[in-house]
Each structure stands twice: as structure tokens, then as C-alpha cells.
């Protein structure tokens, strides 16, 4: 039996821990807050996230070193912009898992690190010293609440080492969760990071009262700019046509369960950034920070991303949503 440590007890970390346990994997969850670890261990539920979901038998702890002891699969389930700081604190125990148990590090985080413009797999490699072949990423249309409820879903596990991707696939395959494998780590990560930004745009449009034509146009043109950036960075175009691209984008842009869409909806309806934060119950809307780093990454590679730029201007430069829409519609017309 595979032994997994899930580091992070937010919505997605909790839901994925349930997936692993349902697949027959031995799971220990690390929670930052001691009271959450206690509830997970004794009540098999997370009172802060997904409180109505009953988890199978999992262990839980507030001690990351204890969670990592003997782990063959390490699931990194913390927000993208705090990943580096967490990895730095966990580094000795992570190195022990790698050196003693040949552990695979699996990132659930979706984002581009602010400042360095690194993808999450690159941050993991830089901080832990893990070889590229040991690092995998998971991306797809994976809304945590639906998966925790056992609703059918699919995802992509990408790793340059196909055998490791297959091992993670086996450890997370259940009757309701179907993982596919891929070796295109770049494509999966760029798709996962950028879709949050486009979801903000779709939420803004919905909040403004715009209709399905507008939303469909944003999703389609959003995919076009995501694909431009991903291919420039070395991704395979077909990856963006799959679960880690179109699949993730559609789910995040259209579902009321999407934090990024919900955040954008408040802005589109005339609410402030503070009101939008309250609407997501204090949980991270990754696209708010990602739009800055994705925009900078695109600029560094001379890739045009007008939707990302518009979202950044609304979230960080104070322009109104109507100004943003006007600037997009006023762009020079061109072939598709």
C-alpha cells in the first residue's frame, strides 16, 4: 500500500485526501491549525472546509515532520504564493522522504510565483533540490466540493517520468475520480495558473449582467491567450485542448463553486475588492495574485494576453470594469 502525506488541509487538500483514502492509499494529512488536525483525526471531518463531508479513516497531525515520516507520495496542497515558505520549513523532512523512500512530490497548487515568475514545479525543485523526474503536478476540472461528494470527475497527472505519473494515477484512481497521465508538465501548469485569471474575467462579466455569448467569448479567447503563452514556454498544444486546459477552464469559469468566478462576480456587480474577498469566505482566489505574475511572464516572453492585462488593471490598477470591457472591445480587429 502506498503511504501518502497530504500537506495542506484546505478544501482541495481535504478532498484529495479523501480521494487517496478511497483509492486504498494510507493517508496522513498535515493541517496548519492544531484544532483542524484534531477534528480530522477524531471526527474524520474538516470543520473549516467541507464540514458536511465525512472522510474515511485518515490520520492527521499538526506536525509536518510526523506526516512526512515514511511517505512515498507527498501531496503539496498549500496556496501557490505560500508554497516556497512552506517548503523551506519542511525541507529536511522532505529530503528524508526523497532520499529514504524515493518519494514523489505532487503539486496541487496552481499559479505562477510572484517575483520569480516560476511555475510551482520549478519552485519545488529549487527549494527541495528534487530532480525534475520526482516532481508531478495535478490539474483538471476538479472543484473540491463536487469531488468530496463523490461526483464523477477526471484529472491529469503530469510528470516527466511516465512511470511515476502512473504510480500516482494508481494511488488516486477511484470509482468516481479518473486520473489520466501526461508528460507535459509545462502545459498542465500554465493551463492551471492562467484559467484562474480568465475565471475572474468571466465572473466580472456575469456580475455585470452580460449573457452567455459574452461568457463563451471570454472562455474561447482566454484559451487562445493561455495557449499562446504555454506553447511559447514549450508546452504541447494538445494539452490545452484536454482536461488541464479546456476542462479546467470551463469548470472554473462557469461554476458558482469557483472562488475566482465568485470573486469576479462581486467586482462586476460593482463591489469592492474587500467585498469580493468576503464573498469567498476568506479563501484564496488565486487569480487575483496570479494575474500579476502571469502578466509579467507573458511580457517577459513578448506574448500578448489582453484578457489577463484587463483583469490585472481592474484588480490592481483601479480601473472600472466598464473601462476594461471598453478597452477590450476597442482593440484592433484582426483574423482569429
Curated annotation (Swiss-Prot):
It is an enzyme of class 1 (oxidoreductase). NADPH binds at residues 11-12, 32-33, 110, 144, 259, 284, 286. It is found in: Cytoplasm. Transmembrane segments: none annotated. It catalyses: sn-glycerol 3-phosphate + NAD(+) = dihydroxyacetone phosphate + NADH + H(+); sn-glycerol 3-phosphate + NADP(+) = dihydroxyacetone phosphate + NADPH + H(+). One of its GO terms (cellular component) is cytosol. Sn-glycerol 3-phosphate binds at residues 110, 140, 195, 248, 258-260. Belongs to the NAD-dependent glycerol-3-phosphate dehydrogenase family. NCBIfam families: PRK00094.1-2, PRK00094.1-4. Catalyzes the reduction of the glycolytic intermediate dihydroxyacetone phosphate (DHAP) to sn-glycerol 3-phosphate (G3P), the key precursor for phospholipid synthesis. This is Glycerol-3-phosphate dehydrogenase [NAD(P)+]. It comes from Nocardia farcinica (strain IFM 10152). The lineage of its organism: Bacteria, Bacillati, Actinomycetota, Actinomycetes, Mycobacteriales. The gene is gpsA.
Amino acid at each position: 500500500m502506498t503511504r501518502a502525506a497530504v500537506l495542506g488541509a484546505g478544501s482541495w487538500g481535504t478532498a484529495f485526501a479523501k480521494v487517496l483514502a478511497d483509492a486504498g492509499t494510507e493517508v496522513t494529512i498535515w493541517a496548519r491549525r492544531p484544532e483542524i488536525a484534531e477534528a480530522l483525526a477524531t471526527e474524520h471531518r474538516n470543520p473549516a472546509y467541507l464540514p458536511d463531508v465525512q472522510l474515511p479513516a485518515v490520520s492527521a497531525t499538526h506536525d509536518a515532520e510526523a506526516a512526512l515520516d515514511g511517505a512515498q507520495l507527498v501531496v503539496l496542497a498549500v496556496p501557490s504564493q505560500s508554497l516556497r515558505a512552506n517548503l523551506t520549513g519542511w525541507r529536511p523532512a522532505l529530503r528524508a522522504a526523497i532520499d529514504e523512500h524515493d518519494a514523489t512530490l505532487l503539486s496541487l497548487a496552481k499559479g505562477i510565483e510572484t517575483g520569480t515568475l516560476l511555475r510551482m514545479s520549478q519552485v519545488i525543485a529549487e527549494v527541495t533540490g528534487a530532480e525534475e523526474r520526482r516532481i508531478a503536478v495535478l490539474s483538471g476540472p476538479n472543484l473540491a466540493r463536487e469531488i468530496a461528494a463523490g461526483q464523477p470527475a477526471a484529472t491529469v497527472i503530469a510528470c516527466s517520468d511516465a512511470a511515476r505519473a502512473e504510480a500516482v494515477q494508481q494511488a488516486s484512481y477511484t470509482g468516481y475520480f479518473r486520473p489520466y497521465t501526461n508528460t507535459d508538465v509545462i502545459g498542465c501548469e500554465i493551463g492551471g495558473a492562467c484559467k484562474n485569471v480568465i475565471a475572474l474575467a468571466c465572473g466580472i462579466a456575469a456580475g455585470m449582467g452580460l449573457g452567455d455569448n459574452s461568457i463563451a467569448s471570454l472562455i474561447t479567447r482566454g484559451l487562445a491567450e493561455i495557449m499562446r503563452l504555454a506553447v511559447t514556454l514549450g508546452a504541447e498544444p494538445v494539452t490545452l485542448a484536454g482536461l488541464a486546459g479546456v476542462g479546467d477552464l470551463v469548470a472554473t469559469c462557469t461554476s458558482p463553486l469557483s472562488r475566482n468566478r465568485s470573486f469576479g462576480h462581486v467586482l462586476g456587480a460593482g463591489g469592492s475588492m474587500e467585498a469580493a474577498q468576503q464573498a469567498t469566505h476568506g479563501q484564496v482566489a488565486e487569480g487575483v495574485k496570479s494575474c500579476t505574475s502571469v502578466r509579467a511572464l507573458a511580457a517577459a516572453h513578448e506574448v500578448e494576453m489582453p484578457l489577463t492585462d484587463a483583469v490585472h488593471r481592474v484588480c490592481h490598477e483601479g480601473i472600472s470594469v466598464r473601462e476594461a470591457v471598453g478597452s477590450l472591445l476597442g482593440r484592433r480587429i484582426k483574423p482569429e
